[in-house]
């Protein structure tokens, strides 16, 4: 296990108490004694996960997992955390299972070559893992902790996203320059759409009607209208008849250069393309597919996260040591928050009062207050941290 050096620990131990000085009470809610909340940070360079105690804003521990952890997700129904380990280039990957109640590694699930992402359904029963090195999607039974199916995708699938109704899996195939759609009930390929160079991510609207995929090797977003079953009125006057609709390509939207990721507002009304080579964001109306605004945002924007009230977008800039704050209604930058070097992932605390920023180059996690939109403290992580997920729960 690779732990921070004594010098690093000393530096952070000085920063932490200073950060708490003058802290306003509304930044830290009063929790019951059995409340727990942790942030799990994957460290790709040290084969570990750093566990952060969110309630007390401190490092809880560091766990050894598999080789090259690259993604993490939490169960919506159990106190478990799932870490994707991409493994050696010529070997198989795995998914480590962490028991969140005692923060220990409880098991591992073998998958295929170079897994890079994980998506969990709303029941917490199934997970979908994109295996970029074997061009497959592993379907995992999380209760049994085993793979139950493998679906063939396009070349180098890097993101698998599940629609909110759990019926459609949208897969971005980066090297295949395509998007695959799977029916989750039958686990069969339903459609494939070509012409998205470097497909790298996907977001799906809350009503499961449409998916958007950034084409990171170009300057476009692919908008796909998802299939809809026929809806018939159950009784006179209850509803209008809605005809069935197949999956179809709706539009290719021009944005900035190399859009790596999309940030969707919680209400689904707008999304933001992070244009990494244009140092900008593009604001897209998800109903009309219109580009509402384009704004210079920072050095190599790679991740965005929208506040729960749909008002503020936070953007992690890999090539600068700050997070840009963007007011959505006003369509402009309103500030920046200091972070570490190489910011690459973002997550809110469950209260929304704290923002955690993963800094890949400096090997730390910056913590910011969202009420004042200001830097709060810096916590150490392992080498090359790259992803984060938070889990909150109450002990019995």
Q: Where do the PLM segments sit?
A:
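Sec-dependent bacterial lipoprotein signal peptides
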Residues: 1-21
């Amino acid at each position: 296990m690779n732990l921070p050096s004594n010098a690093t620990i000393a530096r952070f131990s000085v920063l932490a108490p200073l950060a708490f000085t003058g802290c306003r009470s509304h930044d830290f809610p009063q929790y019951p004694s059995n409340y727990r909340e942790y942030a799990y940070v994957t460290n790709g360079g040290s084969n570990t996960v750093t566990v952060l105690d969110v309630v007390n804003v401190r490092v809880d521990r560091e766990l050894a997992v598999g080789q090259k952890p690259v993604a993490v997700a939490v169960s919506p129904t159990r106190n478990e955390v799932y870490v994707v380990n991409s493994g050696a280039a010529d070997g198989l990957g795995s998914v480590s299972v962490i028991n969140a109640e005692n923060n220990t590694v409880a098991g591992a699930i073998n998958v295929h070559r170079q897994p890079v992402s994980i998506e969990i359904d709303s029941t917490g029963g199934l997970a979908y893992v994109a295996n970029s090195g074997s061009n497959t999607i592993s379907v995992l039974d999380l209760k049994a902790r085993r793979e139950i199916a493998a679906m063939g995708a396009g070349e180098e699938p890097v993101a698998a996203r599940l629609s909110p109704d759990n019926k459609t899996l949208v897969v971005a195939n980066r090297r295949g320059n395509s998007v695959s759609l799977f029916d989750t009930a039958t686990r069969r390929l339903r459609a494939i759409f070509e012409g998205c160079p470097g497909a790298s991510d996907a977001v799906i609207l809350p009503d499961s009607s449409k998916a958007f995929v950034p084409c990171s090797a170009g300057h476009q977003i692919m908008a796909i209208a998802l299939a809809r079953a026929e809806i018939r009125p159950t009784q006179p006057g209850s509803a209008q008849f809605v005809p069935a609709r197949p999956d179809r390509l709706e539009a290719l939207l021009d944005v900035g250069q190399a859009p790596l990721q999309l940030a969707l507002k919680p209400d689904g009304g707008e999304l933001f393309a992070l244009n990494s080579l244009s140092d900008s964001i593009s604001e897209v109306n998800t109903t009309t597919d219109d580009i509402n605004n384009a704004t210079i945002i920072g050095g190599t924007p790679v991740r965005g996260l929208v506040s729960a009230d749909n008002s503020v977008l936070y953007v992690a800039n890999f090539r600068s040591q700050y997070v840009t704050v963007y007011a959505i209604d006003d369509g402009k930058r309103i500030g920046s928050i200091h972070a570490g070097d190489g910011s690459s992932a973002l997550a809110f605390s469950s209260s929304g009062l704290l923002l955690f920023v993963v800094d890949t180059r400096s090997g730390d996690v910056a913590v910011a207050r969202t009420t004042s939109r200001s830097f709060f403290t810096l916590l150490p992580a392992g080498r090359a941290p790259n992803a984060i997920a938070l889990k909150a729960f109450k002990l019995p």
